[in-house]
Amino acid sequence: MKIRPLHDRVVVRRKEEEEKTAGGIVLPGNAKEKPSQGEVIAVGNGRILDNGETRALAVKVGDTVVFGQYAGNTVKVDGEELLIMSENDIYGVLE
């Protein structure tokens, strides 16, 4: 099943969580922080402006983005957890 976001929404696959700290300490599941980076896997058509025109999104499929730890809403598609967020929740694109 595929998911197609509407308007200025973006679907992001969160990066894998770190299992160890930089010092080599293994973290239990509940001590891990949610990663705030991910890969864009789908984008909507764009934001609808007040004059009725549609402005394309600045991010595209395949971009690695940075977002707030609590940004977006989590959904499960085919057993995989994905985030759906507004483009405004994205801080930047890693290059």
Curated annotation (Swiss-Prot):
Keywords: Chaperone, Cytoplasm. GO terms for cellular component: cytoplasm. The keyword RNA-binding does not apply. GO terms for molecular function: ATP binding; metal ion binding; protein folding chaperone; protein-folding chaperone binding; unfolded protein binding. It is found in: Cytoplasm. Its main location: cytoplasm. One of its GO terms (biological process) is chaperone cofactor-dependent protein refolding. InterPro entries: Chaperonin_GroES, Chaperonin_GroES_sf, Chaprnonin_Cpn10_CS, GroES-like_sf. Heptamer of 7 subunits arranged in a ring. Interacts with the chaperonin GroEL. Belongs to the GroES chaperonin family. Together with the chaperonin GroEL, plays an essential role in assisting protein folding. The GroEL-GroES system forms a nano-cage that allows encapsulation of the non-native substrate proteins and provides a physical environment optimized to promote and accelerate protein folding. GroES binds to the apical surface of the GroEL ring, thereby capping the opening of the GroEL channel. This is Co-chaperonin GroES. It comes from Marinobacter nauticus (strain ATCC 700491 / DSM 11845 / VT8).
